Each structure stands twice: as structure tokens, then as C-alpha cells.
Amino acid sequence: MPIPPAYCRKITSHIGGLGKDRTRRGCNMGPMKSRVRQPRERPSGRRRATVSAERSLDGPAALALRRLANLIARYTPHDGAFPLRLPGTFVVRLSHMTTEPMYSTMRPAVCIAAQGAKVVMAGRDVLEYDPAHVLVLAVDLPISSQVIRASWKEPYLGFILDLDPARVAELTTRVYPRGVRKPSDVRGLYVGHSTDGLVDAVTRLLELMADPEDAEMLGPLVVDEIMIRLLRTAIGPRVAQIGQPKSGVQRVGEAVCWIREHFAQPVTVEEMAASVHMSASSFHERFKAVTSLSPLQYQKVLRLHEAWRLMLFQRMDANEACHRVGYLSPSQFSREYSRFFGSAPTRDVARVREEGFTHGGSEV
């Protein structure tokens, strides 16, 4: 049965608080609150990633996707992100195209669209994904996303599975017993082709959710199957980097975890680099290659986003939120907030409340 909307509202109004609910290696890996505003500070020279069509969605594939979409619809009574019975699994419904991107910070995950389509932006990278493709986030990333295909009759319906680095590492040794080749580039966000087997595994996982015992005992086995099938796709070697010790993605992921723990403190790039035993220059280069943001830009995004969350959901005033997230100067905070979100803090939050903002929208 669907998770009650009241429960969904409860979890979405609390997820995303930095420094809370650390469940993986002392790091808060939960999705942060989203923002229905496009950041105004954009690196120049956007890079649009395209993946040529490879999988036909006619016939059996279309029927399989319709079956998956119907299951997702069963667990999404209204727009929003809903947790399933198995930890780290979510389903998403959005019943209209968005005129402005939604802003969020997401954990490592694979995102599968059963219906509809989205554009996702991280730094200079712009990616599109739909039922023919999957989206993978390799590290915690500040992203903005926009629904480009959805309607009330045919909403965007998606599935999200968190990717635990330790479990990815274990399964990688089974999929690649002789070792996995190192990909030519390491990015924190990328798309790849979906497969019939992947869609079938996700469908069977959702079917298990109807029975609590099935979900508890059989669900983890199907989750492993989903990750194995993902590792066996063309983007498998890139996915494997999530769990590879000392890989570029893994080390940046550890640094991101450290930054999220210390986001409100005045830290330097040298201190961030030292946390993962790298030189400052190598760390800066690798961090930006993976996240499309410099380490200090990443920290600023976390500060501004957490300030917005505190003002909206905990009713803090701008001055209190400013100091809580590490700003010493309210005027600097107001300047950077306005530049990032396009409006002064108090005015911006008031407008969001007037628009009836009720859920985090942290779904990708």
C-alpha cells in the first residue's frame, strides 16, 4: 500500500539538514532540501552530454515500462518523493513540466525513469534522461533539474536507488573478478543506456514492496541484482569507481563527506586536501573534474542551501540562519544569497511560502 502522505511530508520537511542522520562513514548522505530556483551563479561554457538512442521502446520494452510505471504510480499518491519499505529506495511522481529548475543536493544513486523525462545540470554539465537511459550520481552533488516531459495524465514517474560504496565494491569483485578497467574520465554525474534486465529487476523489487516480509528478506537480493546489472552495462566501469579505494571518485567522495561535516567552519582548500591526504593542487583539480565545482564553491552552495532550509522549515530569520551556516557578515550572506537564488533571503522565503511549497522535491 502507498506510504501515507502525512509521513511523506514529515520526512521531506526534515531530510537534508546538514550534520544530522549520519549513517555512512560518519557522513550525512541523505538528500538535502530542494529549491525551486535556478542558481544564478553558473560556470560558463555548459557541456551537454548526449547518449545516442540504442534501445527500442516499442513492443515488449514499452509494456515492461508501462508495468513499472503503474507500480510507481501505486506508491506515489501525489507529487513528491516517497520512501519505499527498503532503506535507500524511493519513487517519484511529478505531474507537470517545470518552468524553473529544482535545486537539490543528492547522494550517490542511480535514477531510472519509467515515464517522462528530465534535464539535470551539475556545474557545466547538462544531461537528459528518460525511460531509455539511466542517470548515475557518483558522489554527493549540488544539482538542478527540470522536468521536460510530464502531464497530469502521464506524469513523470521515477525510481531512485542509493548506491552504497561498500556494497558497490563487493559486487564489483564479482562482476569484474580480473579487475575493472579505469575509465578515461571520472565525473560525478553521467547517463547511460537502460536495459530490459534492469527495468525487470526494478519492477520485481517494487512488486515485493506489497509484502513487508518479502521486502525485508528478498528485497536486498533484488537490490544486489539491480547493482550487478548496472555494473554490467557500458557505464559499469564508471559505476565501479564509486566503491574503488583511492579512485578519483572515491577520494572526492570522502572529501565531500568531510566538507559537509565542516561546511559552517572557515576551512581552506589545504585543509580539505589534507583530509584525503592529497596535495592542494591535485585535490582542487580532481575535485572540480568530478563535481564541476571548486571545493570552495561547493562549500558555499551547501551553506546557502542550508540557510534556505533553516529559514523555510525552522522559521529562522535571515540573521540567525546566516550565522548558523558560518557567515560572519549578514551583508555578505544577503549578497551571496541574492546572487545565487535571485532574490534577498527574507523576500525569497516569503515568496516560496506564498507559492505553497510543501515538499522538498529532492528527487532527481
PLM feature spans:
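N-terminal regulatory/effector-sensing and dimerization cores
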Residues: 81-179
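Short, Lys/Arg-enriched, Trp-marked, Pro/Gly-tolerant hinge/linker segments that flank
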Residues: 180-196, 206-276, 289-294, 300-301
